[in-house]
């Protein structure tokens, strides 16, 4: 189906919302459903016009040939909304297709964050990495290559993600979470180099250096390419952020540490984290 085509009504319409990490979860969920039951798919993008943080449609950068619509483009009389909050367990694509057919539903609108490993395949991970890699352009390639070289030359590169600006509602990781995590890593790995990715780089550099760690503040001005840099590190200390969750997931990480609780306002899926990741309790305030 051609991009932005409205000639064919999609059978599945996934609401895109949130930042890069959330949208990657939504993309994987959409592909899981559409491929599992052979239904036409579109992404609904109404929410970005009102996003309080000015977040953009990232999926369109990664999947330029996908279909992106506003809800007004759908025949609302034949639509049904299915919210993640009413589901128990995973959504089976075959059962969903049967439900649409039996109830005469033209388009099923799916709303949620779908943060679950069971919706993500290794093929999708490879595809996301390739799509991000293909985005490199002249404006960002020099900085990207400089940081990539430093990361690849490091025997045990550590990506540390410190996120603060828009996370006061969900809870912010304590400084001691990062310090304890890095001390644990230093006790288990030799020849480490710390690469810090942060929306407050000066703050992050200051408290980590005061704790005795030498750091490299890292970033090339493009959040998607920074995600690729995080993915090229071998060890990860992530924030309670789906952005750095994906940085670790896209990597061949030998050690990933994440904060617990993940959020002060909601409980994550019990199948959101790989079993070989290490949780640090009491990490979020």
Predicted regions and their residues:
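Nucleotide-activated donor-dependent transferases that construct or modify glycoconjugates
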Residues: 5-18
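Secretory-pathway luminal glycosyltransferase catalytic domains
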Residues: 10, 48-184, 188-189
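Leloir-type glycosyltransferase catalytic cores
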Residues: 101, 265-285
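Short beta-strand segments
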Residues: 42-45, 161-163, 193-198
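Donor-binding and catalytic core of enzymes assembling or modifying cell-surface/extracellular glycoconjugates
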Residues: 20, 186-267, 271-272
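A short beta-strand-loop structural module common to alpha/beta enzyme folds
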Residues: 37-50
């Amino acid at each position: 189906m051609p991009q932005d085509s409205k000639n064919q009504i999609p059978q599945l319409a996934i609401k895109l919302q949130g930042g890069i990490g959330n949208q990657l979860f939504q993309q994987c969920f959409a592909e899981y459903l559409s491929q599992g039951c052979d239904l036409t798919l579109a992404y609904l993008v109404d929410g970005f016009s009102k996003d309080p943080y000015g977040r953009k449609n990232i999926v369109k950068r990664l999947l330029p040939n996908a279909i992106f619509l506003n809800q007004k483009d759908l025949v609302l009389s034949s639509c049904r909304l299915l919210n993640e909050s009413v589901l128990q367990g995973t959504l089976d694509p075959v059962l969903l297709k049967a439900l649409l057919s039996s109830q005469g539903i033209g388009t099923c609108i799916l709303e949620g964050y779908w943060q679950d490993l069971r919706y993500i395949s290794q093929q999708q991970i490879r595809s996301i990495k390739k799509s991000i890699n293909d985005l490199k352009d002249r404006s960002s390639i020099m900085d990207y290559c400089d940081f990539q070289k430093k990361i690849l030359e490091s025997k045990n590169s550590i990506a540390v993600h410190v996120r603060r600006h828009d996370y006061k509602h969900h809870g912010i990781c304590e400084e001691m979470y990062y310090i304890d995590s890095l001390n644990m890593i230093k006790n288990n790995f030799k020849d480490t180099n710390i690469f810090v990715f942060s929306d407050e780089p000066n703050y992050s550099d200051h408290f980590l250096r005061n704790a005795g760690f030498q750091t490299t503040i890292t970033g090339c001005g493009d959040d998607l390419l920074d995600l690729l840099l995080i993915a090229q590190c071998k060890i990860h200390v992530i924030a309670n952020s789906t952005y750095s969750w994906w940085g670790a997931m896209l990597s061949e990480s030998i050690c990933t540490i994440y904060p617990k609780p993940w959020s002060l306002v909601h409980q994550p899926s019990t199948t959101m984290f790989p079993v070989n990741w290490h949780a640090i309790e009491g990490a979020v305030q």
